[in-house]
Amino acid sequence: MKNINPTHTQAWKSLEAHKAELSNTTIQDLFKQEKNRFDDYSLTFNNQILVDFSKNNINQTTLSHLRQLAQECALDSAKEAMFTGEKINRTENRAVLHTALRNRTNTPVLVDGKDVMPEVNAVLAKMKDFCQRIISGEWKGYTGKAITDVVNIGIGGSDLGPYMVTEALRPYKNHLNMHFVSNVDGTHIAETLKKVNPETTLFLVASKTFTTQETMTNAQSARDWLLKAAKDESAVAKHFAALSTNAKDVEKFGIDTNNMFEFWDWVGGRYSLWSAIGLSIALSIGFENFEALLNGAHEMDKHFRTTPIEKNIPTTLALVGLWNTNFLGAQTEAILPYDQYLHRFAAYFQQGNMESNGKYVDRDGNVINNYQTGPIIWGEPGTNGQHAFYQLIHQGTTLIPCDFIAPAQSHNPLADHHNKLLSNFFAQTEALAFGKTKEEVEAEFVKAGKSLDDVKNIVPFKVFTGNKPTNSILVQKITPFTLGALIAMYEHKIFVQGVIFNIFSFDQWGVELGKQLANRILPELTDSEKVASHDSSTNGLINQFKAWR
């Protein structure tokens, strides 16, 4: 993968000049200028996902320069490097092969000359057998009862992805009740354990190293809780499975290593739901539906890898996003799913994007000071957000590009709920793009029988400037297949931006310093002695904590 500073390319210089040319052109102007704008600025995937990016402040010249930027930054060779197992995560000397986990064609993928697909398929087969035993009731707990509840204990990618997907695919769930514990705050595990029965609960401990502090603290508490009821160490093997590679510590914990599901160092945590980390998903929706999730992602992988840039959905979203942040000044992007089942989708890609592209050092080791890397990602389901933060999106002083996501078909077609939901979905992007002028506000008042003299002081507050960029992503229906494709679409968008930003998207050194300091502080919290080993603020906080506890 080549190291290319994007600001040194001819395309970047062209985009800077083009920005000035477009500075007085609004989205409304662009719709007037281009009569076929929707057709020319929308793409479809598999006749199941429609991506409309027409309500952005871009024209064909913008897209041409952005595509040239991708070419000058060697995107095509970077894609091939990822898909073929080159060690593009250079700071950790690792390949990046979450795509191999869903490689449904079984085309060989080599890492250090070895095809990884036989191992991938072996773990999938093991997961399938395990799911069949749990779901059918063949697997029994320590009193001979079948499993009714599954508790996934993990953090970060070992929690966010499985939780998001199991929630998104609740219409496909079976009789098993799913629970997720991540926070080291004892409240999280304590409240979860109140809901389950030790005789019928299975715990999945998701930690590659089996040493992750938060995960192992929660796992130990779950083990203690189980043994308090079972009073027999042999019960652990009947109620715990591990998603890990540390067989020694897994066995020491009391878990049968036959119920240890491996994954590899070329699987990053935030891209791991496709691996054994997705066991909770497969248990929740059944293995066939888990395979459909993999199939959807694989189809998007093929689209991303082979489709020309002009029709390439993840690449287009990445380029438009880069334009909004680096040339129009946006520092944040909102992901707004109009589907309650997708209520954790924004949180999932908050990690996916910000942990991947929240970097200030480029691939050459230089500090980046003349362009912006990853944006802040956030969001909530519609229409809840409309009654919370949309005010700022519409009339605030901060530019916030938004992705609106909605299914055409609801899993719960109650009365006219879905039409009301989708009417808001369509209305919001229209309002953000076109706004409402002073003249339109005045005309509304006149129509309502008001005199302009009486309302002149209120008119400015009812004006909407519009010109707020949005993407509309309409999905035929949220199924395992389409969800897999949607997730992979965003993954590849993040990858494309990382390539152009000239950063390493697959490490996360930014999480390390806090962990190191916490390990140093933890022994200081065991007694009541005052500390003086830190700065005055940290000393004061620790000492007050000790006084109050």
Swiss-Prot record:
Metabolic or biological pathway: Carbohydrate biosynthesis; gluconeogenesis; Carbohydrate degradation; glycolysis; D-glyceraldehyde 3-phosphate and glycerone phosphate from D-glucose: step 2/4
Coiled-coil boundaries: none
Cytoplasm among keywords: yes
Superkingdom field: Bacteria
Catalytic reactions of this protein: alpha-D-glucose 6-phosphate = beta-D-fructose 6-phosphate
This enzyme's EC code(s): 5.3.1.9
GO molecular function terms noted in the UniProt entry: carbohydrate derivative binding; glucose-6-phosphate isomerase activity; monosaccharide binding
Pfam families xrefs: PGI
Record keywords, A-Z: Cytoplasm, Gluconeogenesis, Glycolysis, Isomerase
Gene Ontology BP term (one): glycolytic process
Major location (coarse): cytoplasm
Intracellular or extracellular location(s): Cytoplasm
Stated family: Belongs to the GPI family.
NCBIfam families cross-referenced by the UniProt entry: PRK00179.1 (NF001211)
Record-linked HAMAP family: G6P_isomerase
Function: Catalyzes the reversible isomerization of glucose-6-phosphate to fructose-6-phosphate.
Name recorded for this polypeptide: Glucose-6-phosphate isomerase
Species annotation: Haemophilus influenzae (strain 86-028NP)
Native organism taxonomy: Bacteria, Pseudomonadati, Pseudomonadota, Gammaproteobacteria, Pasteurellales
